[in-house]
Structures are given as C-alpha cells and as structure tokens.
Design a protein with these regions (language model features):
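Aromatic/hydrophobic pocket-lining residues that form the small-molecule binding cavity
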Residues: 49, 81, 111, 150, ...
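Conserved, mostly hydrophobic/aromatic
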Residues: 25, 33, 49, 68, ...
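Conserved strand-turn element in the central/C-terminal portion of the radical SAM core barrel
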Residues: 105, 133-137, 157-181, 200-206, ...
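Auxiliary Fe-S-binding modules of radical SAM enzymes
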Residues: 1-13, 190-298
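Conserved SAM/AdoMet-binding glycine-rich loop
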Residues: 58-160, 239
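Canonical Radical SAM [4Fe-4S] cluster-binding loop centered on the CxxxCxxC motif
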Residues: 4-48
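Catalytic cores of alpha/beta
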Residues: 110-115, 174-191
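Hydrophobic faces of well-ordered beta-strands that scaffold small-molecule active sites
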Residues: 17-19, 64-66, 96-102, 126-128, ...
C-alpha cells in the first residue's frame, strides 16, 4: 500500500481499509493542528490507487468499507472521486460505503448533482472537523469557513443522502468562553443532526501557532474540570434523533460513548459521577499532556 507521510483515521474506522488518494492537507493552516505541517499537499496517482486496490482485494476481499486518506480527501473533484469510487467497486465488489475526511470548504465546490452522484457510488460517512459552534472560535482556529457556511453545506450533504460525523473540540474557545461554547455546540449539533459526534480535547502541540498565544497569556486553556463540565453541559442540551456520541478519544478525561437519545441520561450520569471523583487539586489545574492530548496527572 502507498502511504506518504503521517496517516490518520478516526478510531471508529478501525475496520475500514485505508486507501491513500491525497497526501497531507489542502488547508494545513488551522492554528491548533500540526498533523501535516511538514507534508506538502499532493494528489495520488491513479495507478498507485489502483495498485493499492488490487493489493486490498487480495488481502481483504470481503471488506465492506473503504476510508480514503489523507487529511481532506473530499477536496478532490467530484469527477476524480467518482472514478476512484468506481475503481473501488470494480476491485472490491463487497464494499458498501466509502468514507473520508472532509472540510466544509470541500463541499462548497461541488454541485448538488455532484453530491447526488457521489452518494449513488457509495460515498457516505464523511468525517468533518466542525470543532465549534461559535464563529469567533472558527475564525480563531483558522478553519477556513463560517458557521453559516457549515450549516448550508451540511444541509446539502444531508439532502444528497451523504451522512457525516462531526468532530467537536472541547476547550476550543478557551477557559473564558467554555460555557458559551458548550451551548453553541449543542445548538449546531441539534440543528444538523449528524450520525456521530466525535469529541476530543484541544491539545496544544509544539509548532502549533496557538501555542504562542498560550505562552503569551493571550489564550487560556480550559482547566481539567472545565473540559469535563463543557462536555457535560453540551451533552445535557443535545436533542438528537439517532446519533452516536463517541467520546472515547485518548484525550478525553472521562471516556463515554453511547447512542442518543437512548443513552443520554446514562452518559450525563457517568460524566457527573466522574467529575465528582476528580480530586479538587486537579479540577482547577492544567495537567501535562501526553500522546494525542492525554492528561497526565502526577
């Protein structure tokens, strides 16, 4: 398989075959992210993609789902994605759906007809980094889109039949705005009704522009207690019809997962109980962060 540079996938795509169709990230300018900072954006050659599909067909002929990598494979033109999808079905006839990372920006350039065609070819379950329901936070993170643009493009995906999961970054607004952020996150999630919500904490890595703000004291990270309370207050306000809540990223202080609305009360109770068990000395602290933002309590 052809993989260039770092390769990431959502944890819930563990059973999917990863096929590289782009290298790096076409945006690569979010102030919190260093995942692809040293990787030049490129598109994969079709012959390499087909070679990988032949290899996958030999090793995993019964696979049901393919996840296209890297950072925002949906940036490819609708025509290119359609060709790739057709080749996937040719080499892997048991594949039912094809997912990938996508940005709101990637959807804007595709017509309603493009989206409908891609849906017909099995493209479904896009993973989109929304991060926050506040425009001021999206601008600060340099996501490259506004909340209104997100609303419009997510509605277009839904109309075309393309499902999506949304990533929410707890702590993205900083410690002064955590409550406002929690409320705004719940509002946009209730409006868009994603198939899955993936929560993780903001973790400031070396090389990220936002780290300079933290060092200068112009951006204040959530405390450990605020991270949990922000997630809890967001969860309490969620009114969803059929959405997986996936709070199992390694950075999450208290891992929770379930189906909403069925498990809402259970998840709220787990967060409340977990918060009550955290020693007071940690609640107002900014713990050291380890791998992928895991809190290290000493």
């Amino acid at each position: 398989m052809h993989y260039t540079g770092p390769v990431y996938r959502p944890p819930f795509e563990a059973d999917s075959i990863l096929v590289q169709v782009t290298v790096g990230c076409s945006h690569n300018a979010c102030t919190f992210c260093t995942m692809y900072r040293g990787t030049r954006f490129e598109t994969s050659r079709m012959e390499d993609i087909e070679a990988d599909l032949r290899e996958a067909a030999h090793d995993f002929p019964s696979v049901k789902r393919v996840f296209l990598v890297n950072a925002d494979a949906f940036v490819l033109s609708a025509g290119r994605l359609a060709t790739i999808a057709e080749k996937i079905h040719e080499h892997l006839p048991n594949v039912e759906t094809i997912g990938m990372y996508a940005s709101v920006k990637n959807v804007i350039g595709k017509s309603d007809e493009d989206l409908a065609r891609l849906h017909e070819l099995g493209i479904d379950g896009l993973n989109i980094g929304l991060e926050s329901g506040l425009d001021e936070v999206l601008a600060h993170l340099n996501k490259g889109f506004t909340l209104d643009e997100a609303r419009t493009q997510l509605a277009r995906l839904k109309k075309a039949g393309i499902g999506y999961s949304l990533n929410i970054m707890l702590g993205a607004a900083g410690s002064e705005l955590w409550e406002k952020n929690a409320i705004a996150n719940a509002e946009i999630l209730n409006e868009t009704q994603p198939s899955l919500i993936f929560t993780a904490l903001l973790h400031v890595d070396p090389g990220a522009p936002i780290l300079d703000e933290v060092k200068a004291g112009t951006f204040h990270e959530d405390t450990l207690g605020q991270y949990v309370t922000e997630e809890l207050e967001m969860l309490k306000r969620l009114e969803l019809e059929d959405t997986v809540f996936y709070g199992l990223h390694t950075s999450n202080v208290i891992p929770v997962s379930g189906l909403l609305p069925r498990d809402k009360d259970l998840l709220v109770k787990r967060l409340e109980n977990g918060l009550a068990r955290i020693p007071e000395r940690y609640l107002n602290s900014h713990p050291e962060k380890g791998y992928e933002g895991m809190s290290i309590l000493r």
